[in-house]
Amino acid sequence: MSEFFWDVQKIQEISNVEEHSVVKCVTVNTSRLISQLNEELQDEESGVNFIVTQLQLLINNVYEKIQKSPGVPAHRSLMINLNFTRLKFSIAYWDILLERSLDLINGPSKTGARYFITEVTPVDRSRYVENNQYFLAFKANQRLTRNSVDMDEFIDFEILIKQIIFDLFKKNGIPDQDFEAILSRFHNLESLVVAFNE
């Protein structure tokens, strides 16, 4: 059995993010992992295998802890935010490693939750979810979209679509405060992309 290099500091439920899901934010101190990783990365393939193995251990550990605690009703899906104190790599690379780790896991920790990785920030997530106007507007638009799009299809591509829109706006120099106004004028991603390419 591999040594566990993660330090799970706290597990916090973030309310009001999504009505059909319970979101658990798991703060994970990555300093021990990263110091070990510096040694492992001498050989790139063994470094990747090391991270994948460690992610599998973390996913199983966190999933078991969450399942032992009350508060995940059967009618709601579970989303687990692995919130790392330090990333070392980009979020995109961590997502690739996470996907590879999940592919190698069998059992309830793989099928019982959706996972995503973020980096710890000083922002209070609960307060952000309750007060941020852009997030609240996004949730309202998301509810409307849910009524017109098959839910499984929407979930599979949600992160990709957000990233495409965000990159498109940044590439075209659109300020954050104009996002909502521009998005309200378009009904799908294709028409938005076409408008920016004209």
Swiss-Prot record:
One of its GO terms (biological process) is synaptonemal complex assembly. This is Sporulation-specific protein 16. Pfam families: Spo16_C (PF21698), Spo16_N (PF19225). It comes from the Eukaryota. GO terms for cellular component: condensed nuclear chromosome; nuclear chromosome; synapsis initiation complex. Necessary for efficient spore formation. GO terms for molecular function: DNA secondary structure binding. The keyword Cell membrane does not apply. The lineage of its organism: Eukaryota, Fungi, Dikarya, Ascomycota, Saccharomycotina. Keywords: Meiosis, Sporulation.
